[in-house]
Amino acid sequence: MSKKLNTSVGGTPTNTLLNYFSKSPAFDKKKLTPSVKTDPDASKSEKENLQNQQPKVKDGKKEASKPAAKRKLPISDDEPASGQRKRKRIVQPESDSEPEMEVTKSEDDFSDCASDYEPDENEASDDSVSSGAEEVSPSENDMSVDSPTPKKSRKKSKILNNNNNNEPSSKKVKLESTIQLAEGATFQEKLKNLQSNAKQDASYDDIVTNTSNLDEPVVWPHQKLEFLQPDKIKDKEGRRPDHPDYDKSTLHVPEKFLNGLSPGVRQWWVLKSDNYDCVLFFKVGKFYELYHMDADVGVNELGFTYMRGEFAHSGFPEISFDKMSTILVDRGFKVARVEQTETPDMMTERCKRIKATKFDKVVAREICQITNRGTQVFGSQCKIGPNHQPNYMLAIVEKDEGTCSRYGVCFIDTSIGDFHLGEFEDDKNCSRLLTLVSHHMPVLFLNEKSALSQRTQQIVRTVLGGILKEPVPGNGKHACSAEKTLKLLAERYYAGPGSDDNWPLVLRTMQSDMDHLGLTPNDNYKLALKALGQCIFFIHKCKLEPKVLPMARYQLYVPPDQLADAKPAVASTLRRSHMVLDATTLSNLRIIGEEHSLLSTLDHCCTKFGKRLLHHWLCAPSCDVSVIKERQDAIGELIRMPTELQEVRALLAPMPDFERNLAQIHLFGNKQIKQMDHPDSRAILFEEKLYNKQKLQGFMAVLKGFNDLTKLPTMFHQCKTTLLKRITQLPESGGSFPDLSKELQYFATAFDHDAAAKTGVIAPQAGMDAEYDAAMDSIGEVEKRLKTYLVEQERHFGCRITYFGSDKKRYQLDVPESHASKANKSYTLEGQTKGKKPSRRYTTAETRALLKDMQHAEDTRNMVLKDLARRLFEKFSNHYDQWKQCIDCVANLDVLGSLAEYAGQQMVICVPELVSDADQPFIQLEEGYHPCANASTYIPNGLELGTASEAPLSLLTGPNMGGKSTLMREVGLLVIMAQIGAHIPAASCRLSLVDRIFTRLGAQDDILAGHSTFLVELNETSLILKHATCHSLVLLDELGRGTATYDGTAIAASVVNFLANLKCRTLFSTHYHNLIDFFHNDKRITLGHMACMVENEDNADPTQETVTFLYKYTAGACPKSYGFNAAKLAGMPQGIIKRAYELSKKVEAIALQRKITAKIVAATAGNEDTKKEKINALKDLLKQLKMCQV
């Protein structure tokens, strides 16, 4: 098949591109030979013929080409996009006999403008990716200002990379990507990496090579533009990067440069100058195109190949937006979706209404959404992904008070619409702030320049070092304040009659009691409201305000250790009391995390919202005995009914992510998108029919899921425990599970589900929508009037009469010629027919009025039908509270089922007994297992703290690697499991409630914070000493080892003494055996050690000593730490170990002599009454001294 090929990029003539880029003084007219495209609809043989037209070059000579294998697309449905990168192929030189090139003559450089394009059904499901396009609608070239009416659609063929395997290896260029972009790097840094690699590395994987010299990389025009060079680049206000107010999100593009561009190219540069830190997915017809530096990103990150032409250009079809944007967002990029918001006809009409310049004569395009990891919203083009973790956006506002700070915080999950606000005082270590980011780790941090103290900036650099950061204005008209935030919310969302009742409870609490309009902030929450304003500002900047704010659910954030001070009215969503687990404890005990953590061990949840609830339980275990007991009983009952448990887990397994589905359906039904004139309300989507299908299919999947959940009351109708009854039974049976039958019945009968799933259009049933029913009633009434009038006319003419005509010429009276003489002046002749049955057609004032009424009724019906899907989603969202209550019940059931599943897998399990009113805090553990360890190889341990026979503080000694740290972690994790209500792996467990767990485990410095190992230890210990209560559990591992022995011993002894006086449950491990001597008779302290068995201990050669670890907690102290055994296990040379042993013996002897001497001196003091006893003691000490060999 003969086919002319277009040399232009997107239909742009090569000469035009040369003209507009040649105006840049740095432009170099390098010739690029375009690669061959094939029609995606062409037959296989036709594609091979086109491929064969590209010759191979061998030793400078052309040779016949063999048919190339079918090209495998860079990213396909059955290959994970995030997998190994495909090697890119270079553009090969073409022969003189290549097909004749066709050059379109147009003023616009971007093709594929919107038109009357009707996609084929097969195309709609195509998710393949080309280097630019597969098939497009009529281009803007066809819709130029001279010819606004679209021409006949032509195909745009797909680029083929003719990298034949038979080509000599000497002519192949390996194109393996070597760029590693750190998550959190700015767009400019990433772009700089791309460009610098392009200039410096001839084997850079994304550079299209010059056909005259395969070893010379092409430098794209955008890489040579003067205003993009590092020493020239400025923001839109003309500020250089070293300016304190430099805005990295904008770019200064010279007006002279813009004026030399074509309308379409200028349109791209204008959008890019306002969003320089974004990758623009620029809609051109049916495709999203990436130009210039964005094309580099597409090639490097998405596996695209460059389109032919003089500037960098790549792209993909509209249907692949979700996949491509997800890949870039996950890699730390910001993606701006640019849509066409008018058709060529609309553009023509617009140009007629204004005095249009040449730059006005291009279809309008607008940014509809900017997406990064913290602003993900699941709209019609974005599917809900498999990740269940929330993606929080965090804003922090600080008031520096010298040695400490007051923080206002707002963190939100845009995918669900959860807004958390709070304000609190913090200590100099920022403990509460660290706990917040540990419990709710953000993916995006909003930062007001120069508004944070050094200690807070240090947290941002270290703890939040790997996440995205976005600046928010601190001054100027866009600066946020509490007053501005309340004013904006009042004007857009909560104004109107009864506005006091419109405000959410949390926001009402943050307003001044003296201002009934709600525009004055409470002094205690000014910082929190300012943080909320910063989040709203950024959401608005990303075009998400009407999508996120209307579904916002506000919750008060109170630091876990401050819950007791929370007002009941505003803390109603919080549990009465929780255990506090700070950032250090979460990390040291590995409570949360994807691998080898307590969360990953216990997580057998079937639903994503269940997984999120389990995460919340583990971060905030309950301190309410009644809550814990209810959970224990429910888990026990689930364990005793394994059949029902597996049935319910099978029921829950296929459930969608209902929480995100609710937010998505709310977005689909949100009329404020149109009311607030959001660009998405004007966007022209070529796959809109497919999106409508997907919307309805997803909606019906949600309805099916809720329908399936209505089986739960029947499945658990015989349950006995209080909690299971509450979360599975209907209100009439004493439960809290909502009765959804009425709502589900309505949506089941409102429309034909099968037809809607196939067509993407709702065919409503009577009673579904009042406005639709009213319109249909109006149509029915007009039809009755038409019938009545027709009967009257038949009586008048004395014959049978029918209506004739269609559309605007309907309802003409078709009167036989033989009776037409009875028509008087009130009848208007509209036409007549000849032949066997001649007739005349008349209209009257009555028929014209009936036609007008019918058209009005039909217009109303069509308007309702067009908006019917949105109204259906809106009705669903109106019952949000019921759906959410059902989700909460199911989430609790899922977590309980997960804990029951875990318990069923353990060899040993028990139900902990918790005591809330104990006189003395205690813990009794018998044969306990580490919950994350393999029980078959783990040695169980038991201990007692705070009982009648044992003191609350255990001074723990034992050999190196003997299991001291493991025991401490085991105790901490088992206590957490006990207080979330789980059954724990132990023979038995009894304890009083723990209000907080403190840990000081491991040895590590903090280089980024400038903290040494010892300073880190002391900071963590200081926190313990300040905040521990008698109900806390303290786990301290080898405190003092980071400094000199005597300093460390003294600090450790002082801390032990403090904790012993506090009488909190403590495990204090140490290798300082002087502490044992100091506290060995102290009744406040219990001595314990990790048992071991030693062979050849008295041997003079330490390398012959063998230590067998028994990993068993035993009463009493361990005489030494057996460090030489650890050295032997580590493979140290035996000579070094022996020499160390000799030195150790000498040091021990010196220390012992000093100790004995001190006792002799003490023994000689005193009066005559004790002289005899002291003389005897002195004789014993002298004997010991003689035994010391130095």
UniProtKB/Swiss-Prot annotation:
- One Pfam family in the UniProt entry: MutS_III
One GO process term, biological-process aspect: DNA repair
- Which residues are annotated as modified residue Phosphothreonine in the UniProt record? 7, 12, 14, 16, 33
The annotated regions of Low complexity compositional bias extend over 159-168
Q: Where is the composition biased (Polar residues)?
A: 1-22, 138-147
Recorded hits in CDD domains, A to Z, give: ABC_MSH6_euk
Q: Which domain of life does the protein's organism represent?
A: Eukaryota
Q: Where is this region: Disordered?
A: 1-174, 230-249, 824-843
The entry's cellular-component GO terms read: MutSalpha complex; nucleus
Keywords (alphabetical) are:
ATP-binding, DNA damage, DNA repair, DNA-binding, Nucleotide-binding, Phosphoprotein
- Phosphoserine found at: 8, 22, 24, 95, 97
Biased segments, Basic and acidic residues type: 38-49, 56-65
Q: Which parts pass through the membrane?
A: none
Q: Where is the composition biased (Acidic residues)?
A: 109-126
**Chain positions recorded as ATP binding sites:** 958-965
Q: Which SMART domains match?
A: MUTSac, MUTSd
Stretches assigned to coiled coil: none
Q: Which PANTHER family match?
A: DNA MISMATCH REPAIR PROTEIN MSH6 (PTHR11361:SF148), DNA MISMATCH REPAIR PROTEIN MUTS FAMILY MEMBER (PTHR11361)
Q: How does it assemble?
A: Heterodimer of Msh2/Spel and Msh6.
Family per similarity comment: Belongs to the DNA mismatch repair MutS family.
What job does this protein perform? Involved in post-replicative DNA-mismatch repair.
UniProt-recorded name of the protein: Probable DNA mismatch repair protein Msh6
Q: Which organism is it from?
A: Drosophila melanogaster (Fruit fly)
Q: What is the lineage of its organism?
A: Eukaryota, Metazoa, Ecdysozoa, Arthropoda, Hexapoda
Name of the encoding gene:
Msh6
